[in-house]
Amino acid sequence: MRDCAGKLLARGEPFDVVIANAGVMATPFGHTADGFETQFGTNHLGHFVLVNRIVSLIREGGRLINLSSLGHRYSNVDLDDPNFEWVPYDPWIAYGRSKTANILFAVAFDRRHRDQGVRAAAVHPGVIQAELARHVDASQIQKLIEQRNQQLTA
């Protein structure tokens, strides 16, 4: 992301909209090249670094859109243990942490930049068939649907 941001800054072309959409879901335990848990690093920290480095390129009236997920309901962000060093790794908790971080980032970004005419939002894109779910099998998805239905009818 740092290299990408550097190239964008060197070009100097402004943006009307930045959509932070890179992501992974329910991955096996692993780390990014920078040593962060894969989902938190990919889904949140990558966006955070890129956007904060190129914020000067977002025009007045521009927008930042963070693709989050209803999966944010699985977990709050745990900044005391973002890499699962003290608790067992759970891919859905990790996903939830990253998606909660997307939302919190959008809220904080909006607060910091709205007076300059730049706004931010986090959105749930809906359920779609995509490579995002490549680490999830059908039984896991069915279990999630059943859990959600139980919550909605309780």
Go through each PLM region and give its residues:
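Rossmann-fold NAD(P)H-dependent dehydrogenase/reductase core
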Residues: M1-V136
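Secondary-structure junction/capping motif
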Residues: E37, D90, Q142, Q151-A154
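A short C-terminal helix-loop "cap" of Rossmann-like NAD(P)-dependent dehydrogenase/epimerase domains
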Residues: E85-W86, S139-Q151
